Amino acid sequence: MNIDLHAHTNQSDGLLAPQQLIDLAMENGVDMLSITDHDTISAYALINKLPRSLKLIPGIEISCSWNNRTIHVLGLDIDISNQIFIKTIKDVVDQRLKRGEKISKALEKLGIKNSLDGALKYADQNLGRPHFAQYLVELSLIHI
């Protein structure tokens, strides 16, 4: 049995849309998959077609503070309809946006304009550092 319990989509810092990830998992013989995007469960609402042969385990990777450090905790087999959980995730996403505003101000001091808007083009709802990196690639300021 092939299992992947830690996969990201473009709803956080992955490159593939949720349905593309599921299709790729099927092409590669994955039997059980958990989409564990950073601080969001939005990928699950974007899945159009789930093959019967693929068991999808609802998951998330949540950013937490512990001993003055940020750590990531995987949650598996979560209830994606729990309203308290959804509210908590929204609060974390709001914090990520505030962090993004700080990153944007720092980039502005370096002469890079409109970085918040640029990063948000790649972020959908859940802004993170990789989205700023994608914008810097777009501007040809960094190369991968």
Name each model feature, range by range.
Residues D94-A119:
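Conserved phosphoryl-transfer catalytic core
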Residues K121, L127-Y135:
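Glycine-rich, often acidic, oxyanion-interacting loops/wings at catalytic, nucleic-acid
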Residues L46, K102-K109, Q134-L139:
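Histidine/acidic residue-rich metal-binding segments in metalloenzymes
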Residues D79, K90-E101, A123-N126:
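Short, amphipathic alpha-helical segments
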Residues L46-R52, E61-D94:
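Active-site phosphate-binding/coordination module
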Residues M1-R69:
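An N-terminally biased module of ancient metal coordination in phosphate/nucleic-acid-related enzymes
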Residues I142-I144:
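Conserved small/polar residues in nucleotide/adenosyl-binding loops
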